[in-house]
């Protein structure tokens, strides 16, 4: 009897283990504690506003691997491997065709590219890149990890798997993971010719056991957002299927919602469920829908505003969708989307409207993307709304998943002496981390006429910062991966400070600490400057510092920060060129933390 109970218990335990999903992404750099304020003045919430991090909540995002896989100047069938199509040497390419630029140049008679050719709706911040650009993939891994995205879901809905590109992404993610990064897992979404696509995907990726540690598992098995009907038993049993397509209300595919995960839906979105129809499993959140349905980024309260009233960067549609998702509070939020960027040009008359205006056969339309308003990408763009959607997404993710609290201490035990030995920093309580190995050079072909994108701006890999407060001073520590060139404080290394009591100044900061252009003896001076406008700084003092090898320490008298308020935000940035725009934090040199993010420190009330 005891043996029977033991066997039953073991089987029950094994069953429970088999139901486990992949762990949620937990940033080793504690990115969920970082502060940021976007170009619209919207600040990210922290633990006090969203509560503690919930390790049972998941976020996935639609990710696209097709950029360059269907040709450049004209549409082509994929090459046999379904990877990025090599460019022909010596060919005079005309693309990329950017619809927004085409319309700006010839609004009445747009000079589009050929029919069926892929057109960009706008320019990505990292340029018209190809999907196998490792430098871009690394930036995507960093941005999505910092945002708290648990899984990227590759779009293979058009019966093309793009396996070489998926493998390139996994190769980069795996390398970053070995460097100590937390990276999103991967999954796929199928639709057209789903049996053929799933068999190809299974044989080329899963059956071979490739990058198994990157597979996203949902309740015991690798997740496949697709249709299990008609598949061989071996494949049908291998995956946990969740059928996915567009819209829900009155849609036959969605039915009652059991095991259905839509990738786009009208507000208020319906949720998919698994065990119980009263227990939401998944809901979708999208930034917009389609130009041919006239549902853009500004659509809200049930209608699309007239053209002279849209505000594409404000995220009204996205905000409504997040509102619904947070009310439903499912296990999994699926976001559409990250980096689609292109759409085919059609003239066959299948669409009857574009942006609410009637069109007839022979006139141009684009189904999924058209311009800044009628597009769905969250990845930052060049110009336009910049990175607004990236931070709006993070706002929603934090409200859904929560965030870790900041370290608070009445007294920091460390006592700092600027002597270049750095042992006194070992007891510092406030330690801040950045990603290791994120200053690799870029040299990769771009789309069509763009021969190559290059970037060699990275020089000092910023790894760790510390902060110690006393009654009179704030002391900062920085460690880099390698020693500073020449053993001296480099030009271009800057510590930016933002206090909670003053309006933001240049680049959103009130003060900056950097090397002066003046040198006394052999040692460069360190100065603190105050922002006097959005573009101008004025020096207010010189500061003491010590530098040895790959470590730097400096102290700042609180006299220079009058009325700082309750908190301080700070950021280290290093590049050969000056940072003149917050967007340059994305691709110039290295920043700690990344992009617009800042580390946040709660000032000790006993020391204020």
For the regions a protein language model found, what residue spans apply to each?
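Aromatic-rich peripheral "rim/lid" segments of glycoside hydrolase catalytic domains that contact
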Residues: 176, 349-422
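N-terminal carbohydrate-binding/catalytic regions of secreted carbohydrate-active enzymes
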Residues: 42-168, 337, 341-378
